[in-house]
Every structure is written in structure tokens, then in C-alpha cells.
Amino acid sequence: MSQAWMIASGKGGVGKSTLAAALAVGLAMRGQRVAIVDADIGLRSLDVMLGLENHIVYDLVDVIRGTCKLKQALVHHWRYPTLSLLPAAQMCDSSQVTDLDMQRIIFRLKKDYAYVLVDCPAGIGRGFQNVLGAADDTILVTTPDDVAMRDVERVCGLVTEYGLPRPMLIVNQAVGEMVRSGDMYAPQVIAQTLDLQLLGVVPKSEQVYRRLLKQMTAIEGKGDVQAALNRIVRRLIGEQIPIPMIEKDSRAAFTRLFRRDKKGSEWL
């Protein structure tokens, strides 16, 4: 059965699109048919991350306007034949797209692909809300800092209010030494505090930026980052892969971010 995952974050700069591209490639490397949709209208980026910027003729808004058919807008990856990209429009904004438009497009993609990944714009604006009705599940991306975690908690609330299952969480740019010293929140504590399933932890590494400069995704190659991303992909396709934990319980540090009352934990 086909699945559509929306990949979202509270704030920008947490590596959401980088991870979305990597997960799409990781699934394709395992022979899965994958479509990835760039839903960040006006600020597309996945075409560059996937090395496909010179292959775009049509985009998502062209499909909605009827300028082209969906199959004409899909860009097939030259290295991974089971991976296709539906690029965002570069010269439009989110007002050109409705939630019904996204539902129709995702529904059609699910007929031909086993996995549909939708890279949402950061935040909780219209672009994010347009995708809510089209997704089966949500993957939230955060970094282990106060601002990112507070924002992702807000996104999680909107997702569950809409009726979708509790999101899965990826903690990106974790630094083991800082977690062990108590200077950074432990990923498992973040997941427990937000009451989310921890899908995976990706360490911070200069490798990622270097690969982006070479138009390679973060999952390509060998190293700690690639190993972490491959474990996440294997979990997504149903394998039971344990998550290596960084042993430092920094739960006490959350007292400055949360307050507890009779209703439970709330953000300050």
C-alpha cells in the first residue's frame, strides 16, 4: 500500500529539505518507487540538492493550472531510475495552490509510487496547511535547541488536531560530546518530552555540506551520517532497527522550557 509522508519542521535551517532529499534517495537505492514533491512554492531547492536543476521543464503549479500533465512535470533521476521529483514553482507563491490541489496530486502519485515524500515549507503557514489533508503520516525534523523544539511542538499540535497520527521525529545535527557533557539535549529526552516516536538521530557533520556542494545527497557515501540515514530509511520500510542512544539524561534542563500544571506539560 502506498504511503504519503509530509516532512515538516517548525523553524527553517534545521536540515529538513536536506533530509527529505536523502531519504528519497535512500528509498530509491533500495529499489523502491519514490516520488518527492517540493511543496515550498517560490523557494524550490530539491532540484539543486538532487542535481536535477537543468532538467526541469514544468512544475507543480503548471500541473495545477493544466499547463501540463503530471507525468510531464515529473523529473526522473538520472542515477536512481525509481526516483522522481515534482519541483515547486519558482516564480509563484503558496496562494497559487490549495489543499484540494495537493490532495489530488498526492492521490495520483500514490497510484504509481510506493512512497510519496512531500517536503513542506518551514513553519505553519499556508504551504504547510495545504499538505495536511494529503498526507498519511508526518515526519518532523528538529535540531536539539530550544527554539527549534518549541516550534516543532506547535507543528505537532496542528498535525494531531487535524486528525493525523502522532508524528515521527528526526533529531538532526546532534553532537554526541555535547549531549554527554550536558550542554545539548539528548535526542531520546526530546522525543519523550514531546511524546513522539523517535525515528532517528543524525549527527552534525561537515560531510553533509561538502556533499551538497558536489550536488550529492547526505546519504550517499560512507560515514556516521550515512549510517544514521540508512538506519532511518530501513525503519521507514518496516525493519526493526534499534536507535543508538547517547547516554546523558538532560531531562532536568527542560525545566526552563516547560512548566507543569494540572493539565500537563505546556510550553512557556
Regions found by a protein language model. Name each.
Residues K16, A20, T98, M102, ...:
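Short, conserved glycine- and acidic-residue-centered signature motifs
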Residues L100, R104, R108-K111, Y115-R210:
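Conserved catalytic-core segment of NTP-binding enzymes
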Residues E161-L268:
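C-terminal lobe/tail of nucleotide-utilizing enzymes
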Residues A4, L85, L198-V201:
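Conserved beta-strand scaffold positions in the cores of enzyme catalytic domains, especially
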Residues S9, D38, P87-Q90, C120, ...:
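Flexible glycine-/small-residue-rich
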Residues A4-K69, Y115:
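Walker A/P-loop NTP-binding active-site region of P-loop NTPases
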Residues A39-K111, R210-K214, A218-I219:
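P-loop/Walker-type NTP enzyme "switch/lid" segment
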